[in-house]
Amino acid sequence: VACKDFLTNKVDRSVTGKIATQQCCGEIQLPLNDCGVVALDYQGKRGIATSIGHAPAVGLISPENGSIMSIAEALTNVVLTPIEGGLEGISLSANWMWPCKNAGEDARLYRAVEAASDFAQALRINIPTRKDSLSMTQKYKNGDSVYSPGTVIISTVGEVQDIRKTVTPVVKPVEDSVLVYVDFGKSGQKLGGSALAQIVN
């Protein structure tokens, strides 16, 4: 929805000289990469990959699905780099952003955390660390209050076998290559969390 150029262009994206994959890619350096990859040293091919995922609009409809979608997005963002150990070689960090102490929000947070735990365990992925910001409410003197949608920001980290094999969204003229469309909507074309759903509701 908003251009990310300011955020990516105002900083040095190659600090340390070990950045193998940064935010931008392609001839005109658009911020399209789904994950970041950093080399472990200056000569080897191993590294560390990280990505994020969040789904605040989905969380408004269902805190459970918001958690699951956040994890799913973070994982699909890091899937195109060769992680040591595959899926089980990825660790997650969960940053819970929630307007607690408002009616029903503590219960929604509990359901969201439980869903994240169940989903991660089913995938055999650990969540060894977390952070929380549980006072996401702004109160005014006239009695009005505004609070943020409860959401979890998921970060992934995993060791990369070969930093040279990370796939980026740059279409390259490689002979005998194909573009593959993967339909993740087998459960139906749900519109929850979409711009249309926000307008209708």
Predicted regions and their residues:
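Glycine/proline-enriched, intrinsically flexible loops and inter-domain linkers
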Residues: 1-201
